[in-house]
Amino acid sequence: MTKADIIESVYEKVGFSKKEAAEIVEMVFDTIKETLERGEKIKISGFGNFIVREKKSRVGRNPQTGEEIEISARRVLTFRPSQVLKNALNLSDMVQPPV
């Protein structure tokens, strides 16, 4: 599903104009992005948590040459689905066979 698909879904289900639906979806994504950039956790009840984690620098190895290289510190984004979402996914697997 793309952002355009999400906008279309909001347009169809809520009854806003396509322009209004697009603005709302953009605002939601902007808010999520800004919150994560500040390093804050996002908790969406019944869906899951987006968490920014700090990774320390470490020594790694180039798989082609075997040479040791320094991997710099960085921030990574993780997602932990809620139990509600996990259960919904498992139920939908029972109803619809995977393609």
Curated annotation (Swiss-Prot):
SUPFAM superfamilies for this protein: IHF-like DNA-binding proteins
Keywords (A to Z) from UniProt: DNA recombination, DNA-binding, Transcription, Transcription regulation, Translation regulation
Signal peptide (UniProt feature, chain positions): none
Entry-linked CDD domains: IHF_A
Record GO terms (molecular function): DNA binding; structural constituent of chromatin
UniProt key word Ribonucleoprotein: no
Presence of the UniProt keyword DNA-binding in the record: yes
UniProt-listed InterPro entries: Hist_DNA-bd (IPR000119), Histone-like_DNA-bd_CS (IPR020816), IHF-like_DNA-bd_dom_sf (IPR010992), IHF_alpha (IPR005684)
Domain of life: Bacteria
UniProt xrefs under Pfam families: Bac_DNA_binding
This protein's GO CC annotations: cytosol
One BP annotation, GO: regulation of DNA-templated transcription
Function: This protein is one of the two subunits of integration host factor, a specific DNA-binding protein that functions in genetic recombination as well as in transcriptional and translational control.
Stated family: Belongs to the bacterial histone-like protein family.
Assembly and oligomerization: Heterodimer of an alpha and a beta chain.
Record-linked PANTHER family: DNA-BINDING PROTEIN HU, INTEGRATION HOST FACTOR SUBUNIT ALPHA
Protein name according to UniProt: Integration host factor subunit alpha
Record organism: Anaeromyxobacter sp. (strain Fw109-5)
Gene for this chain: ihfA
